[in-house]
């Protein structure tokens, strides 16, 4: 700070403005020169404002003495002296003032200009992801779509400006992309209309079964899908009907003559034929032994 004080020994312009110039090898700061105010550097830590006032009263009526201190109250070694009347600041700067054998460093008081156009870089606005859509797995004539409510999008950070006015906030309206499909399903009970006919369609679960018979030339290695038995919910109404999805083409494996005649067999007939086949197979093994 003492070097900055020595650099303030330049001349005062008529319009009370100071540009960036050099004086004794030091660059003077840019800003506006405060009238009737002197910068005082090299202040000893033991000096107080009353003692400094007594040294500058010989140049005019002192209005205020201000010593700059840090947060703890310790002097930073420089301050300002302002006069009540118009004084020749250049004459005071060129004078030699020493306190306790130490020369004070004087100069014009310059107020730095603030950049009013400075602002912080805006942060990107954070908004919630698109709301997933849920489709009911129940088969009904009226397709139901459940959309989770979306929170209101509000900008987290706006431009921090030093202007006196405030700019209006910009709200970004979020749009849900078309064709968005969630990675999970949502099961919801259907809303039935009184008097509407209810149809329950339960998809069958198939198990792959391999059959390989080497004794009988009429049987070949075949793979077919056999549905697993499913149980209807206890709350669903009981209807006497035949589920066509349980029937499968299995009769061709045990009775080649019925390949064209009996295309579909029930699950009960399938297990009956299977037990009969294992019984015949066991008898053939005993005869060969």
Curated annotation (Swiss-Prot):
Keyword Cytoplasm among record annotations: yes
GO biological process assignments: 3'-UTR-mediated mRNA stabilization; female meiosis II; oocyte maturation; positive regulation of meiotic nuclear division; positive regulation of translational initiation; spermatogenesis
Subcellular location: Cytoplasm
DAZ domain residues: 162-187
Database matches in Pfam families: RRM_1
Keyword Cytoplasm: yes
Disordered: annotated span: 1-20
UniProt xrefs under InterPro entries: DAZ_dom (IPR043628), DAZ_RRM_vert (IPR037551), Nucleotide-bd_a/b_plait_sf (IPR012677), RBD_domain_sf (IPR035979), RRM_dom (IPR000504)
Main location group: cytoplasm
MF terms in GO: identical protein binding; mRNA 3'-UTR binding; translation activator activity
GO CC, alphabetical: cytoplasm; nucleus; ribosome
Domain RRM, first and last residues per copy: 36-117
Keyword line: Cytoplasm, Developmental protein, Differentiation, Oogenesis, RNA-binding, Spermatogenesis, Translation regulation
General function of this protein: RNA-binding protein, which probably plays a central role in gametogenesis in both males and females. Acts by binding to the 3'-UTR of mRNA, specifically recognizing GUU triplets, and promoting the translation of key transcripts.
Family: Belongs to the RRM DAZ family.
Name of the protein this chain belongs to: Deleted in azoospermia-like
Source organism (scientific name): Gallus gallus
Gene that specifies this protein: DAZL
